[in-house]
């Protein structure tokens, strides 16, 4: 029974649970790697050895956190669990493909970890730029293993994206318009479209790199008429939509949390929120070269990418102000998910402001590859995506096993985590402005103060992670069952009770229009 249920599962709730557990495990691996980085940088001088091993750790940290923590939890975990419940579908459109989507992840993670363990590891950074990622600078199997790992996780995400798009468009009740689906469903839909359009380009780029390394092609080798800049264009055409893939489901979750704990039936400006997400998704594809301001592009090209990047701030601002408007006049309940959501809104805004600064190509020439960039994207990832995941987890946890997390412990956990991530990443802005470059294992003594503070912050974040494991254990040990859930008519995922039955909506849901009700 256990093998058929968990290995051959075709149930969206079970596969979502597998994704959540896998993501939690990968998150701990990624956290361990990040602590190695911060231990190395806690004071001047070498700890682990040379820059190669340092960069192997940094590269693995990025890949693990992006592809095996954030995406499986947000899209695989919350997406699988909530989308069918929110649209009244009995399951996903392709349940077996859903299972395959998950089971491609563990072998992919194994390949990635193997790539770090053989030869000298992948010391290229997560971008794997040639010629550093080529077979001269990185001889041996490491980079090839990492490329295969990316192929698998890419196939997994593409299959998942096809599944979500089909499910959301085709499996709503017949009378329901797309504009009646909850915002989280919209966010997963936009995310899935981004995945479907961007991942094939990454696959093309890394496949060309694979043949350059092993079959003597010269796609990225000027000696044979190739161009390493081509790889950068292909990579960032995927890489920029990818960062929006990481944050969009978080937008959807935060919209639900803010509305719920403000006692509102719906978020402020539903249509504006939907169109903002679609605008972010579209604009995300036409700004990729802002990662390449230092490779020698024409001034008019730089002007375009600067302007286009700044325009993304407009729909993002629409979302931030709509969340604030949702709070306005609400009967606010200061429960833990609301704290995570408010932290998310504030820190996403800070990360967005540093993003506007980096969008200026003239400024970016100076700030590119400094810790300012690291601070910027960790504000939107380590404090945007992660705070959204934590808020979603605390909010929807009662739905998954049917038990409630401890209200006081989760608030303390929020406080510790919030202090930890801010102490880790705010000093990095000053390091970047002072010119400290990224991807070096050592630094001049002048940078010691901010680095030591940053490393102390990372230790505080570690205590928060351990505390959260205790909170999860406590919930399963105490077995506090859910009593009642408020506002179920606008939060239909709760309608079937906590936890919901194994099969929900076994016959098509009947949706009555608001007009008919009056």
Swiss-Prot record:
Protein's membrane topology: Multi-pass membrane protein
Residue sites binding Fe(II)-heme a per the record: 61, 378
Domain of life: Eukaryota
First-tier enzyme category under EC: translocase
Stretches in topological domain Mitochondrial intermembrane: 41-50, 118-140, 213-227, 287-298, 358-370, 434-446
Chain positions recorded as Cu cation binding sites: 240, 290-291
Binding site for heme a3: 376
PROSITE patterns in the cross-refs: COX1 (PS50855), COX1_CUB (PS00077)
Topological domain spans for side Mitochondrial matrix: 1-11, 87-94, 171-182, 262-269, 328-335, 401-406, 479-518
Binding site for Mg(2+): 368-369
The protein's annotated pathway: Energy metabolism; oxidative phosphorylation
Cross-link (1'-histidyl-3'-tyrosine (His-Tyr)): 240-244
Catalytic reaction equation(s): 4 Fe(II)-[cytochrome c] + O2 + 8 H(+)(in) = 4 Fe(III)-[cytochrome c] + 2 H2O + 4 H(+)(out)
UniProtKB keywords: Calcium, Copper, Electron transport, Heme, Iron, Magnesium, Membrane, Metal-binding, Mitochondrion, Mitochondrion inner membrane, Respiratory chain, Sodium, Translocase, Transmembrane, Transmembrane helix, Transport
Major subcellular site: mitochondrion
EC number of this enzyme: 7.1.1.9
Any GO molecular function: heme binding
Cofactor (UniProt): heme; Cu cation
GO biological process: electron transport coupled proton transport; mitochondrial electron transport, cytochrome c to oxygen
Cofactor: binding comment: Binds 2 heme A groups non-covalently per subunit.
Annotated TM spans: 12-40, 51-86, 95-117, 141-170, 183-212, 228-261, 270-286, 299-327, 336-357, 371-400, 407-433, 447-478
General function of this protein: Component of the cytochrome c oxidase, the last enzyme in the mitochondrial electron transport chain which drives oxidative phosphorylation. The respiratory chain contains 3 multisubunit complexes succinate dehydrogenase (complex II, CII), ubiquinol-cytochrome c oxidoreductase (cytochrome b-c1 complex, complex III, CIII) and cytochrome c oxidase (complex IV, CIV), that cooperate to transfer electrons derived from NADH and succinate to molecular oxygen, creating an electrochemical gradient over the inner membrane that drives transmembrane transport and the ATP synthase.
Family of the protein in this entry: Belongs to the heme-copper respiratory oxidase family.
Classification via PANTHER family: CYTOCHROME C OXIDASE SUBUNIT 1
Protein name (Swiss-Prot/TrEMBL): Cytochrome c oxidase subunit 1
Organism name: Polypterus ornatipinnis (Ornate bichir)
